């Protein structure tokens, strides 16, 4: 429950009649004219118990100040009292009798007779019309917080606020969005994934030539043995030919030599042959390749035709050991 307190006009009359506040007196009680001490604290200095006691009493009456809880603020008390006096419709200031300068500055007010209900309505309607006309005449930049608060306080509002509704534009907004938004296909989400399988067929570049894969067989042990036997026979034949070559002893300047002349042996028995040395070639067997031919069974006439263009090597004497 809000605390009920006395309105400002009867409270002010009671304070004037009590004669407890210095400077607050009736000038003309019949015309309800009174004065209030209005000393400027910044210029003349204040005595709270003498110059600001009326403002402090009003702050205590309205509950804005409690002794011991808040620090005293005389300037704020005076400003709140002035605003309350200006808001009263049945009290007006007599400006031609007020003194605003000096240490004895006072303000003079007149209490008007109480207004009837019809007068109150007319006064409120007039104030609301004045506020509307001022709002139309003034541009937006000339508005002040005081003017806006005065217009709100002077305007009358009905007690029933149920008919105050905000117009809804949701339907129109939705229609505009539907017209502006292009039609989109519905998006469906499925939890199953398709099987990603691609058939792969390997086809050769040319289908005309198709061959079966074949592996060459390894040589048998018998074939390898025959190759080794042939190589052994060839070496034996060469050694026999070298052994059958006749070495003849001879002496040159008292020194003994062995002489081997080709063709000294009868051709009918051994046949003639030629031996040509080849340069050394690294081979897996590590032997010197010799080109030779067995001419035992060769015709002598054919042999002569083959050996005619061959230049015989020069014969060198081999010294014998003494």
Curated annotation (Swiss-Prot):
Keywords, in A-Z order: Acetylation, Activator, Antiviral defense, Cytoplasm, DNA-binding, Immunity, Innate immunity, Isopeptide bond, Nucleus, Phosphoprotein, Repressor, Transcription, Transcription regulation, Tumor suppressor, Ubl conjugation
Main localization of the protein described in the UniProt heading: nucleus
Name of the protein this chain belongs to: Interferon regulatory factor 1
Post-translational modification note: Phosphorylated by CK2 and this positively regulates its activity.
InterPro entries: Interferon_reg_fac_CS, Interferon_reg_fact_DNA-bd_dom, IRF1/IRF2, WH-like_DNA-bd_sf, WH_DNA-bd_sf
Functional summary from the UniProt entry: Transcriptional regulator which displays a remarkable functional diversity in the regulation of cellular responses. Regulates transcription of IFN and IFN-inducible genes, host response to viral and bacterial infections, regulation of many genes expressed during hematopoiesis, inflammation, immune responses and cell proliferation and differentiation, regulation of the cell cycle and induction of growth arrest and programmed cell death following DNA damage.
Residue span of region Disordered: 92-164
Activity regulation field: Activated by MYD88.
Naturally occurring in which organism (per UniProt): Bos taurus
């Amino acid at each position: 429950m809000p605390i009920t307190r006395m309105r400002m006009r009867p409270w002010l009359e009671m304070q004037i009649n009590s004669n407890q506040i210095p400077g607050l007196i009736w000038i003309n009680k019949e015309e309800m004219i009174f004065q209030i001490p209005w000393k400027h604290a910044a210029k003349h200095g204040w005595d709270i118990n003498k110059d600001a006691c009326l403002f402090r009493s009003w702050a205590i009456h309205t509950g804005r100040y409690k002794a011991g809880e808040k620090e005293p603020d005389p300037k704020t008390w005076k400003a709140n009292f002035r605003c309350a006096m200006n808001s009263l419709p049945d009290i007006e200031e007599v400006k031609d009798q007020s003194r605003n300068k000096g240490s004895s500055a006072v303000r003079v007010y007149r209490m008007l007779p109480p207004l009837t209900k019809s007068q109150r309505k007319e006064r409120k309607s007039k104030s609301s019309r004045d506020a509307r006309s001022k709002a139309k005449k003034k541009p937006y930049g000339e508005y002040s917080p005081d003017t806006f608060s005065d217009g709100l306080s002077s305007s009358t509002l009905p007690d029933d606020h149920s008919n105050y509704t905000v117009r809804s534009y949701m339907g129109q907004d939705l229609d505009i969005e539907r017209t502006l938004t292009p039609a989109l296909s519905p998006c469906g989400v499925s939890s199953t994934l398709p099987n990603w399988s691609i058939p792969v067929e390997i086809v050769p570049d040319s289908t005309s030539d198709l061959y079966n894969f074949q592996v060459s067989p390894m040589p048998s042990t018998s074939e390898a043995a025959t190759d080794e036997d042939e190589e052994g026979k060839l070496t034996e034949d060469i050694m026999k030919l070298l052994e059958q070559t006749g070495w003849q002893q001879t002496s040159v300047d008292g020194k003994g030599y062995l002489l081997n002349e080709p063709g000294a042996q009868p051709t009918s028995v051994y046949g003639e042959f030629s031996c040509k040395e080849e340069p050394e070639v690294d081979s897996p067997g590590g032997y010197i390749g010799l080109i030779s031919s067995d001419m035992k069974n060769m015709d002598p006439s054919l042999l002569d035709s083959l050996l005619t263009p061959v230049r015989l090597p020069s014969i060198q004497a081999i010294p014998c050991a003494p």
